[in-house]
Curated annotation (Swiss-Prot):
Lysophosphatidylserine (LPS) lipase that mediates the hydrolysis of lysophosphatidylserine, a class of signaling lipids that regulates immunological and neurological processes. Represents a major lysophosphatidylserine lipase in the brain, thereby playing a key role in the central nervous system. Also able to hydrolyze oxidized phosphatidylserine; oxidized phosphatidylserine is produced in response to severe inflammatory stress and constitutes a proapoptotic 'eat me' signal. It catalyses: 1-(9Z-octadecenoyl)-sn-glycero-3-phospho-L-serine + H2O = sn-glycero-3-phospho-L-serine + (9Z)-octadecenoate + H(+); 1-(9Z-octadecenoyl)-sn-glycero-3-phospho-(1'-sn-glycerol) + H2O = sn-glycero-3-phospho-(1'-sn-glycerol) + (9Z)-octadecenoate + H(+); 1-(9Z-octadecenoyl)-sn-glycero-3-phospho-(1D-myo-inositol) + H2O = sn-glycero-3-phospho-1D-myo-inositol + (9Z)-octadecenoate + H(+); 1-(9Z-octadecenoyl)-sn-glycero-3-phosphoethanolamine + H2O = sn-glycero-3-phosphoethanolamine + (9Z)-octadecenoate + H(+). Residues 1-74 are cytoplasmic. The gene is Abhd12. InterPro entries: AB_hydrolase_1 (IPR000073), AB_hydrolase_fold (IPR029058). This is Lysophosphatidylserine lipase ABHD12. Keywords: Endoplasmic reticulum, Glycoprotein, Hydrolase, Lipid metabolism, Membrane, Transmembrane, Transmembrane helix.
Length: 398
């Protein structure tokens, strides 16, 4: 009996030992599996975090790009809308074109006292005010020949007016748009002409500088006519020449045409940087570049000019002018293209109205850099004027 129970007991003990060993192994395996899964989760979480951060950064960058593109597109649409709107605005408000042509609101240089030409280095110049019409007053400068500058000190307006009767020729200078009679390049030209023995009379059209009135082609021409008659009433038989620059050439040919029609022509007409007519000049002007090929350019931009009564038809006026004509033009003129000055000469030269008078065209090479308003710098200018107009009276005291 005892022998049979021992094996059973031993068997049970082995089974128990085996069972406890199996359960321990299973528990260890289970713990290992859990640990492995936890490690895998941690590893997965660690690798996922950089990916999610990278994705967020890319999203932010894309967002910024979209926002920038949206703003850029908005700006482009605004510019395009503005570009398209301007022609319609000009067509509906022709006065805008008149403002851009006259530019009388641009006063350069600023802060100068036009009552004091001596502040601009013109110490032999007198400031006048004339009244062409009831509600119009224009400021005038009269610069005498430079050899009289000492005698001119402290003299009044009457002395200057009497000086016009001296035996020296007179140039009536008609300036272009923008600025005043005190513009830098204009003052330098007065000095050159004065040094050559000429009286120089210039003025600001109504609406320019300190002159009172509203600008218009008719008004500008009438102002010039009034000043011319004022000069002739005081100058006796002295030669009177008319010099127009840029837009002033339009005023000059309007004036001379009227003078010729009433049979009181000037002794000569000088046109510096002239154009043919205001339509061709406006089409060739640098400001028109961005619209020059715009559909309906003439209808939108040029027709409003003529509908405002602005023509400045130099080409048409040439057919009615009978006096010597000198045209000066720089090849590198960026404002009034050289070819317009040449074209005007080609219209005038064969005209019957000039058949008994000298017509001359003087080009200035682009290498000289005289552009639109610096022809006065040319050392050849005194010779050109002397040969065309004749030698001015020898210098003498007044």
């Amino acid at each position: 009996m005892r022998k049979r129970t021992e094996p059973v007991t031993l068997e049970h003990e082995r089974c128990a030992a085996s069972g406890s060993s199996s359960s321990g192994s299973a528990a260890a395996a289970l713990d290992a599996d859990c640990s492995l899964k936890q490690n895998l989760r941690l590893a997965g979480k660690g690798t996922a975090e950089p990916h999610s951060a990278s994705d967020a950064g890319m999203k932010r960058a894309l967002g910024r790009r979209k926002s920038l593109w949206f703003r850029l597109r908005k700006i482009l649409l605004c510019v395009l809308g503005f570009y398209i709107a301007i022609p319609f605005l000009v067509k509906l408000c022709p006065g805008i074109q008149a403002k851009l042509i006259f530019l009388n609101f641009v006063r350069v240089p600023y802060f100068i006292d036009l009552k004091k030409p001596q502040d601009q280095g013109l110490n032999h110049t007198c400031n006048y005010y004339l009244q062409p019409e009831d509600d119009v007053t224009i400021g005038v400068w009269h610069t005498i020949p430079s050899v009289w500058w000492k005698n001119a000190q402290g003299k009044d307006q009457m002395w200057y007016e009497d000086a016009l009767a001296s035996n020296h020729p007179i140039i009536l200078y008609l300036h272009g748009n923008a600025g005043t009679r005190g513009g830098d390049h204009r003052v330098e030209l007065y000095k050159v002409l004065s040094s050559l023995g000429y009286h120089v009379v210039t003025f600001d059209y109504r609406g320019w500088g300190d002159s009172v009135g509203t600008p218009s082609e008719r008004g500008m021409t009438y102002d010039a006519l009034h000043v011319f008659d004022w000069i002739k009433a005081r100058s006796g038989d002295n030669p009177v020449y008319i010099w127009g620059h840029s837009l002033g050439t339009g005023v000059a040919t309007n004036l001379v045409r009227r003078l010729c029609e009433r049979e009181t022509p000037p002794d000569a007409l000088i046109l510096e940087s002239p154009f043919t007519n205001i339509r061709e000049e406006a089409k060739s002007h640098p400001f028109s570049v961005i619209y020059r090929y715009f559909p309906g350019f003439d209808w939108f931009f040029l027709d409003p000019i003529t509908s405002s009564g602005i023509k400045f038809a130099n080409d048409e006026n040439m057919k009615h002018i009978s006096c010597p004509l000198l045209i000066l033009h720089a090849e590198d003129d960026p404002v009034v293209p050289f070819h317009l000055g040449r074209k005007l000469y080609n219209i005038a030269a064969p005209s019957r109205s000039f058949r008994d008078f000298k017509v001359q065209f003087i080009p200035f090479h682009s290498d000289l850099g005289y552009r639109h308003k610096y022809i006065y710098k040319s050392p050849e200018l005194p010779r050109i004027l002397r040969e065309f107009l004749g030698k001015s009276e020898p210098e003498r005291q007044h």
